Structures are given as structure tokens and as C-alpha cells.
């Protein structure tokens, strides 16, 4: 199983390209750029990075919709224990959950079953991904999922409306993480949380490209920069960190 996984990652690596987000730049850039440009630095570009650094970390290239097959690979549950991840969330039936970078809905639809009186806001910047999810919603008669096309700056969520914001192997690809997270914080209810699930940089055995992994310390550093503090950490996933953050104030 492990051997075939390496071949699959190599096969889709050409799909992790930055132009996916570049075409979604908003028109009112001047104010936003002037207020946050100092938090980013330009530097040497890695072959799977964008040459843009945030708090010492090079931002990774984005995985395009052409790599959607990898998101739904049959062995994913065995590799990542996704069902354990979902249990870790401790969702209530009425919760409003935002799945950022929802992709094909691999996490979105199982979560929707866990919040029958709530809803899942499935956010993606690629219309092709949203179209895939819309087709699945129609085929399976799913009514408590709302599709939202976000931007590279904002998930476009209503303020003070979300109980849990979930990033699964997505955060490290955000081209504007500071702006995105500031908007995420605005969307949280008073006791809302952000959950980061990221491949473990500390474990060299995790078969994922370096820029698509993060250390626990780096995750905490970047969340602290937008006013979030670590509430809980679980180490029960084989390849990934599971970190829960809440508002510091």
C-alpha cells in the first residue's frame, strides 16, 4: 500500500500549481495589501512552493481540481483514519461547520450527517470542486450543505455564525493566510473554534512533500498571530496533527 501511494503522489505533483488562486484576486487590493504586506517576505522559490514566506514558512503551491481523484482515494481512511478525525470534532447535531478547501466533499458529506439540524458550509476557491460537490448533493439528496466560492483573502462566511472551522491539509496552501485567518476569526461564534489538521513535519516517515507538512509549533505560531490560542491537541492520527484553537480574548 505504501509503495503505491508514493507513485500516486508523484503522478499528481504537476497539479499543485499556483495559478488556481491567482485568477481569484479581488479588485480592491490596495487597502488589504498595505495593511498586511509587512507580514510576508519574498525569497528563494522551492520547486513546489511559491517563493512567498509567512512567519518563516514558505507557502506551498495549490493542488488543483485535476488532483481530485487523490482526495477520494480508497486507501485514505486506512492512511489517515478520517473517521477518527470526525469523532475528534465532537460535533453537536445543530452545529454550523465550515469546511475550508472542501474539495470533492470528502469530509463535507460525512460531517453533514453528524449535524442533521445544523449545516456544513463547504468553501472552495475552485468552481470545478464546487460543481463536483453540487452533483453529489443532487445524487444523494443532501440539503444541509451550502456551497460557497471563497477567495484567496476570505472564505466569505457570515460574521459570528460558525461553531467550527475545519482545515484538513489545506492551511499550508493559503496564499494569504493572515488575511484569511482574520476573516475566519470574524466568522466564529463567541465559543467557536478552528481545527487545523496538517501532516506532521516532525515525522520524516510521513510520505508527503515537505512544504505540504507543518510542525505543531509553526501551527501555533501562525494562529497566535491572528489572536487564536491552542485549546486542545490530539495525537491519535497516524500522519497528521489535530489542533483545536479558540479566541484568545
Region annotations inferred by a language model:
Residues 7-16:
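Bacterial N-terminal signal peptides
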Residues 163-177:
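A short SAM/SAH-binding and catalytic strip from SAM-dependent methyltransferases
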Residues 195-220:
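Conserved class I S-adenosyl-L-methionine
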Residues 98-154:
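Class I SAM-dependent methyltransferase SAM/SAH-binding core
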